[in-house]
Amino acid sequence: VYKRQLLKKKMHAVKSMGRRFEREDENMTAMPEEETAIYFELGTKDSQIPAGKTVLDYSLDQLTSPDGGRVLAEHISLRIRGSEKICIIGKNGVGKTTLLKKIAKDLMERSDIRAEYMPQNYEDQLDLSLTPVEYLNTTGDKEEMTRIRTYLGALKYTADEMDHSIRELSGGQKAKVLLLKMSLSNANVLILDEPTRNFSPLSGPVIRQMLAAFPGAIISISHDRKYIMEVCEKVYRLETHGLVETNLQSEG
């Protein structure tokens, strides 16, 4: 019953955002579909985390490459409390994605938080053989399927895209599936690897605003300076000797 009430609230919010888009679209010059902005709400008051709660207290003596062939970094330590939003930056190949995968594995096994993960390769998390509706529907209930179709429609999926396998979708559409899953699961911790990279320039500001307003915690990797400045409260640079908190503004 609680889950259905939560879905109804989210459906109402998505419908309202869809109507808002339609009103604004009437006064705008027509643009290609891939440049269409999306309006999306992520999280509820139930996604809030008490300020004193330790979300992550992570330490690792050595971060090795996926094949175990070389040491990427040493003496890694990261602590996150409450609804902090942090970003890990660093040079390509330094091990950011490898580290985030390890953190995601630990957090998603926890029962005291509700963590969801957007990997760099969406295929690591998505079942490509399913349609978006099948992937998002957790109960098999027809009423829930109808709600999910309403959500997807508000996110500019065509009816055809809703019934095609996820494998056939664009990178941006796959990212939307993952974001919608995060919303429907009422996650309070988001683990995001380059979350803005597949969204159009028009949707980028909306995605950043949505993530900045998320009431839970965010642990992310990004090269997107706008995302880092607008969403993240703390920034850590991954160096060979560990994570170093840094001020992005001072780096120019």
Where in the sequence are the language-model features?
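ABC ATP-binding cassette signature C-motif
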Residues: 1, 48-252
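Coupling and communication elements adjacent to P-loop NTPase active sites across diverse families
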Residues: 3-69, 81
